[in-house]
Amino acid sequence: MLGNKNISMAVIRRLPKYHRYLGDLLDRDIQRISSKELSDIIGFTASQIRQDLNNFGGFGQQGYGYNVEALHTEIGKILGLDRPYNAVLVGAGNLGQAIANYAGFRKAGFEIKALFDANPRMIGLKIREFEVLDSDTLEDFIKNNNIDIAVLCIPKNGAQEVINRVVKAGIKGVWNFAPLDLEVPKGVIVENVNLTESLFTLSYLMKEGK
């Protein structure tokens, strides 16, 4: 069920939102919810929610709705959140520091193990409990510390070179904030986060009054 590769990315991208809202419900000690009530909270139709969850077998009961804790746990498993991930962050500028300082990633099981930078002025800087390391040591650190994910917070110039290095060192997942579509071999997953594109979307929606 969890290995189904025919599920659309649109469905996959809705799952984190379900997970987040269900977590909020648990924080409010809400144990049961219907698809209609979930629809009112999230903004998707009840039919869409049922269709999305049915891709993974369905979790509701007729006349009962969803057990919030059970659904939250199962969606977490579908998203791969039932295991921890070790990450390195490349680029210790303002964006990199903001990400390194965000405690929510650790709470979710994503542990940043080290920060790297090529700028001599950044190397040795203390950020949280980390001392920024020279990016020349990046590959050795990845190989010796069971690193799963590389977070790239660097300019697009040089980003492809860095991705080539981390992939060669064994990285299988990249969270890319560089404004560049990176080329990677089969088996390596890249999730691009383009802040400018998101801002442009906001600009459009404001222009249209939506």
UniProtKB/Swiss-Prot annotation:
Gene3D superfamilies: NAD(P)-binding Rossmann-like Domain, Winged helix-like DNA-binding domain superfamily/Winged helix DNA-binding domain. Its main location: cytoplasm. Disulfide bonds: none annotated. It is found in: Cytoplasm. GO terms for cellular component: cytoplasm. InterPro entries: CoA-bd, NAD(P)-bd_dom_sf, Rex_DNA-bd_C_dom, Tscrpt_rep_Rex, WH-like_DNA-bd_sf, WH_DNA-bd_sf. NAD(+) binds at G91, A92, G93, N94, L95, G96. Keywords: Cytoplasm, DNA-binding, NAD, Repressor, Transcription, Transcription regulation. The keyword Glycosyltransferase does not apply. GO terms for biological process: negative regulation of DNA-templated transcription; response to redox state. GO terms for molecular function: DNA binding; DNA-binding transcription factor activity. Residues 17-56 bind DNA. PANTHER family: REDOX-SENSING TRANSCRIPTIONAL REPRESSOR REX (PTHR35786), REDOX-SENSING TRANSCRIPTIONAL REPRESSOR REX 1 (PTHR35786:SF1). Modulates transcription in response to changes in cellular NADH/NAD(+) redox state. Belongs to the transcriptional regulatory Rex family. Homodimer. This is Redox-sensing transcriptional repressor Rex.
